[in-house]
């Protein structure tokens, strides 16, 4: 089989399963409205949970940062790309979340890959929730450490896996809020079991940070858990992009030596770090509290109005509200019908989610209004 035959076969298989991914160029993709092809849609696909991507205070901080520092960092943080803007942001993040150190990364994917690659060796073992994000599971699969998966949020299964002999160290990996189902991990129980077996816990809280907990401190703070490794990302609650790893001083020093994604990548622009500082200030403020409270109200309105639809509503209290349709083609058809009626919704299909669980992944944000939720419910009820 030639290279072209191999590529064509893979694409044909995706098409046959109604699982071929496509991109849509949009003029605006974050916030309340999505604009594409000169048409405006209510946007129920964005991860901009607090509606901060268009916040004037954050935009102004980025502009001023660009004027002060330029539009790029100029290099890796190990060469010339670590600015005072990066340093101050790291210090503010560490203070906010109660850690000794924070290290910035260009994306959550890079942060997860870097940490697992740097921390794990052949004699160690990774034990991950089976529904963990692709960045975590791919990093674990590429690691020299064996990977064991425990049933989703099943602490008893986790304990059994941890109890089996391991010559090295054990790292338990999970998410705070799961990206495709919107449910939360029982972090307190997971940490307790992990500690009983002398393991370390790594939590990716991409979808909880900024959105839940006191001052938006996220899932771990809400559940009174402090994992050894906490990954937070800035493309969701913060409304920007990038990520950080929160850890101890010793672990931070170690990652600075061995985390290749950090060492060999150009740092995020200092102007972006300034925008993230402004976003953090909003998240921690009374305005941040008001946005989170509004989001909770919108979620409650949606869940109350969708109960009688002939789809499975995931057990989620988060901004992620999946409607499980099951069949790939049915999910695609529903998403298209909703778009035709002014609601931009994304159909998520295998391999992103397990086979037979294709869904409409609906995301609500503080930028929405109650009438937007009512319109979404009206359209959903008209297409059931």
Curated annotation (Swiss-Prot):
Record-annotated disulphide pairs: none
Alphabetically ordered keywords of this record: Biotin biosynthesis, Pyridoxal phosphate, Transferase
Residues that coordinate or bind substrate: 21, 133, 352
Pfam families to which the protein is assigned, alphabetical: Aminotran_1_2
EC number: 2.3.1.47
Enzyme class: transferase
Superkingdom per UniProt: Bacteria
NCBIfam families assigned: bioF (TIGR00858)
Family recorded in the similarity comment: Belongs to the class-II pyridoxal-phosphate-dependent aminotransferase family. BioF subfamily.
Subunit structure as annotated in this protein's UniProt entry: Homodimer.
Entry protein name: 8-amino-7-oxononanoate synthase
